[in-house]
């Protein structure tokens, strides 16, 4: 049973809290308890000591879910249950994160957005939680939440409107009240007819747009680890996680067909929105038909196992995501220099790579790293700047906000040892290189939207236009090259 929910920033500063009862603790009290009983919950998600849930009292457990998109922490305090595991709570927190994005029609939620809409978010939690349990009815559809929590009204307007209606009801004569009730019943029956649902995730009342618009956004995040073998790279493990989001602003109740060309990739069994029609239990990415919800929603999620595809095809994979990387150790007269070169492929649909950062990890060969003191000195770099870490043996090559495709950035440096004698034989090598970047215009797997068609159910007037299109974005998850 859920007792309370909290939203904090990455430094665990409170932004929002929703308490389901008078006995539910504030985040200040919960924070004190967490500090004393399970401080690992306060660690960053990348830390080795990080915990995502822990007991904080008798029959009390706290969960912490980190939203990668919004860079926010979602906390939940719940009573322990033998019938439910941690996955239930994390799934619900992930669903709440998605609902907030779709409700506000945003790609990312800012702290200011949450603070300015505190009352609406409280009402959204009220819709999604019933008697301390997730509301498993149709309320988890965003269109239902938008009906219960209007986007252009706040809590104060609800209260003032209710008070005004009550005052009018008291002042009206009994005869007038009866007439008013009859009119309300008549209007209510007409309203039910007007707002009759074709599908539970869409109502006709919600679909009143000046123009008809339908946009598909395909985002892929890839995770790969390469091993350097002489002058070649060998894929150790790799996968791609893809999501297809849709922004639909269509009138009436149209039937939409999206054709996805997988370019020979095996996307397995994808996770689908309830709106997707499945014929004879078989899903075909080349013909995805659905009556869309109104606004932003996630159409499907898929995964591509690069490791198995490379193994089955027997084709060597040296690069992915427009990038191929090569580095060498033992260069220079004293064999203490290294060079790293990056080939950013020239692609017609991609003009630039954004937020490129490369982490370098050095290692001492056959020795304890603490026994040798050294620093990294840069001799030449064609792009960006290099920053040494406070941790010895680590540094970061930081590029500008955008880097043009078709370029070959090069970084050359050397290892400067401290307090070395004439018989010093230890060697420091560049061991691991990690890349982080993103780009727009192409997916890493090559998957693309072949067609977006309105099959039926859409009436386009003389002054109404239809706009549709697709956008692609690729970003790195974990991209490593190891020696």
From Swiss-Prot:
Coiled coil: none annotated. It is a peripheral membrane protein. One of its GO terms (biological process) is intracellular protein transport. Keywords: Cytoplasmic vesicle, Golgi apparatus, Membrane, Protein transport, Transport. It holds the Pfam family Adap_comp_sub. It is found in: Golgi apparatus; Cytoplasmic vesicle membrane. GO terms for cellular component: AP-3 adaptor complex; clathrin adaptor complex; cytoplasmic vesicle; cytoplasmic vesicle membrane; Golgi apparatus. Part of the AP-3 complex, an adaptor-related complex which is not clathrin-associated. The complex is associated with the Golgi region as well as more peripheral structures. It facilitates the budding of vesicles from the Golgi membrane and may be directly involved in trafficking to the vacuole. Required for the transport via the ALP pathway, which directs the transport of the cargo proteins PHO8 and VAM3 to the vacuole. Adaptor protein complex 3 (AP-3) is a heterotetramer composed of 2 large adaptins (APL5 and APL6), a medium adaptin (APM3) and a small adaptin (APS3). Belongs to the adaptor complexes medium subunit family. PANTHER family: AP COMPLEX SUBUNIT MU. Present with 3410 molecules/cell in log phase SD medium. This is AP-3 complex subunit mu. It comes from Saccharomyces cerevisiae (strain ATCC 204508 / S288c). The gene is APM3.
